[in-house]
Swiss-Prot record:
EC number(s) given by UniProt: 4.1.1.11
Reaction equation(s) it catalyzes: L-aspartate + H(+) = beta-alanine + CO2
Pathway: Cofactor biosynthesis; (R)-pantothenate biosynthesis; beta-alanine from L-aspartate: step 1/1
Protein name per the record: Aspartate 1-decarboxylase
Chain positions with Pyruvic acid (Ser) modification: 25
Cofactor requirement: pyruvate
Organism lineage string: Bacteria, Bacillati, Bacillota, Bacilli, Bacillales
This protein's record includes keyword Lyase: yes
UniProt source species: Geobacillus sp. (strain WCH70)
Length: 127
């Protein structure tokens, strides 16, 4: 049996731009992608903390060190510049590997810099 588990999460990032006239996707600072192990073209779930919207798209790497989180295409209708979002990637893990699976979580500051990098989400944590 296989299970779908959270593989990586970018928590409390601020939307820097919403570009309706782009083909689609989310552009994310490549340094942040590297830190959590997300890759270009990876399918991700976006959760908008401001309005409760949840949707899926794929990643485009952005300029390193820029702090960019730009929602492109139709997804731009679901966010506004300044909204707080969570970006989540998932992995399909065989049952026998679940105990060894360790997701990475980047907690972002107000400038989209990694404030804390956590391996495996702690239980009962309020962030």
């Amino acid at each position: 049996m296989f299970r779908t588990l959270m593989n990586a999460k970018i928590h409390r990032a601020r939307v820097t731009e919403a570009n309706l006239n782009y083909v689609g996707s989310i552009t994310i600072d490549a340094d942040i992608l590297d830190a959590v192990g997300m890759v270009p073209n990876e399918k991700v779930q976006i959760v908008n903390n401001n309005n409760g919207a949840r949707f899926e798209t794929y990643i485009i790497p952005g300029e390193r060190g820029s702090g960019v989180f730009c929602l492109n295409g139709a997804a731009a209708r679901l966010v506004q510049k300044g909204d707080i979002i969570i970006v989540i990637s998932y992995a399909i893990v065989p049952e026998e590997k679940i105990a060894q699976h360790r997701p990475k979580i980047a907690i972002m500051d107000e400038n989209n810099r990694i404030q804390q990098l956590i391996v495996e989400e702690p239980a009962h944590t309020v962030l």
